[in-house]
């Protein structure tokens, strides 16, 4: 759970303080007791609770966020991995624990938490991080809280699976870089939910592209367009904050807008193909069909300029009754590669259209593979740490959002070196009020 949205009266991309309220709130919300903290500064294998070779036999899992994505992540890791066990959960909503019975019926002894270590509340995540029985924590809350949760998990000595995006503002990006470096120092793993990097047709297509099958990369187009997204009506008795957490996709301080929360998959693929993040972004878009209190735009069109003067034209859209398209087309000096989302596969042709290679896709296996890679790397004593690349992709999405919101040509270096944008509310109160939903206006919304 995390991020904040433009204040219409202030004409800025956020009404939040540019300082660091995210860390201050989360630190105050759940201070670690000295005794527990001392027990969790290092991974369990390092603390001598497992075989001398440092390899974990039973990998014990905790999760923060039991919504749809969290439940999906649990199904994936419990399905693909042997000798794993869910031992602790956290969520702000006690009703979310209803999923545990279904998981127990499906996975049996792999699920131990029913009636056990199930923590509820805004600070419940700390109880999972403080638990010495937890080796791996899955971070699957709305994105706004993710940067600080990541850093706290690493500081608690946990291995981490973190959903995308890992940040939705420059402040969160810097927190992610700090967590990345500390994980390497600690010897703890961080695997992220960018499943295209584990989908076989994507992997093979990129290998061939980088191997020269289409010649020199000239440019690219990418589309992440669908028919809409869920919306939840406010329930009687909810505070402003409770409602926004419940309907989190539609508030920028929590989701980062669709370009960050949803379309980051294609943006991550763009960076993968191009070898890193872009230099700048220039974009436009707007709101046409969203409910009045939704801060999300339903369309963004961004031109990303990558090193070597290579342009990537990116589009994301969520409008009912429109044509869906999830595709990436990479233009080379000698050929063209088209890589489709979900299960449609990939194809490479020469400049005349003659097929040179093709491959079917299977996204289902990719969802599970990321969890297998995480656990395998832990057991092998070679923990994967991939947070930096996902943080860069997440900030690339933020770069596009800010370019659209402000109407300016926004530089990567500005976000990484100068921007003070921090979207987390300065005074977070679970039972309190929030500013009226605000909508960015290009030309009026300012860079921070």
Predicted segments, located by residue:
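C-terminal helical cap and adjacent loop that interface with cofactors, partners, or active-site loops
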Residues: 19, 28-36, 47, 72, ...
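Active-site beta-strand termini and strand-to-loop segments that position acidic
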Residues: 303-308, 331-333
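Predominantly a Rossmann-like dinucleotide-binding segment in NAD(P)-dependent oxidoreductases
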Residues: 65-70, 185-192, 196-294, 320-322, ...
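Short catalytic-loop micro-motif centered on adjacent basic/acidic residues
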Residues: 88, 138-139, 160-163, 190-193, ...
């Amino acid at each position: 759970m995390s991020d904040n949205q433009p204040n219409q009266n202030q004409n800025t991309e956020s009404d939040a303080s540019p300082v660091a309220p995210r860390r201050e709130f989360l630190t105050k919300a759940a201070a670690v007791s000295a005794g527990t903290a001392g027990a969790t500064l290092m991974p369990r294998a390092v603390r001598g609770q497992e075989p001398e070779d440092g390899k974990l036999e039973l990998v014990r899992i905790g999760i923060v966020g039991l919504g749809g994505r969290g439940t999906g992540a649990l199904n994936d890791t419990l399905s693909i991995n042997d000798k794993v066990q869910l031992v602790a959960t956290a969520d702000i909503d006690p009703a979310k624990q209803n999923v545990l019975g279904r998981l127990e019926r499906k996975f049996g002894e792999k699920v131990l938490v029913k009636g056990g270590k199930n923590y509820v509340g805004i600070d419940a995540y700390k109880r999972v991080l403080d638990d010495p029985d937890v080796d791996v924590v899955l971070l699957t809350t709305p994105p706004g809280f993710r940067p600080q949760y990541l850093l706290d998990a690493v500081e608690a000595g946990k291995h981490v699976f973190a959903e995308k995006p890992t940040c939705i503002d420059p402040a969160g990006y810097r927190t992610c870089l700090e967590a990345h470096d500390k994980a390497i120092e600690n010897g703890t793993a961080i695997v992220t939910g960018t499943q295209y990097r584990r989908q076989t047709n994507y992997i093979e297509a990129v290998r061939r592209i980088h191997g020269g099958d289409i010649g020199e990369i000239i440019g690219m187009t990418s589309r992440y367009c669908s028919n809409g997204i869920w919306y939840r009506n406010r329930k009687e008795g909810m505070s402003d904050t409770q409602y926004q957490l419940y309907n989190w996709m539609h508030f920028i301080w929590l989701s980062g807008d669709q370009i960050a929360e949803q379309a980051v998959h294609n943006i991550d693929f763009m960076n993968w193909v191009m070898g890193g993040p872009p230099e700048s972004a220039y974009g436009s878009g707007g709101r046409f069909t969203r409910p009045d209190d939704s801060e999300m735009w339903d369309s963004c069109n961004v031109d990303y300029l990558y090193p070597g003067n290579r342009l990537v034209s990116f589009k994301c859209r969520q409008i009912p009754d429109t044509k869906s398209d999830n595709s990436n087309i990479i233009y080379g000096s000698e050929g063209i590669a088209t890589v489709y989302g979900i299960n449609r596969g990939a194809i490479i042709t020469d400049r005349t259209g003659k097929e040179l290679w093709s491959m079917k896709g299977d996204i289902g296996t990719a969802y599970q593979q990321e969890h297998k890679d995480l656990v395998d790397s832990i057991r092998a004593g070679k923990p994967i740490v991939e947070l930096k690349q996902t943080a860069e992709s997440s900030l690339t999405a933020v770069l596009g959002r800010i370019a659209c919101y402000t109407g300016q040509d926004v530089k990567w270096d500005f976000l990484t070196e100068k921007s003070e944008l921090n979207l987390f509310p300065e005074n977070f109160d679970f039972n309190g009020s929030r500013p009226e939903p605000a909508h960015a206006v290009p030309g009026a919304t300012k860079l921070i």
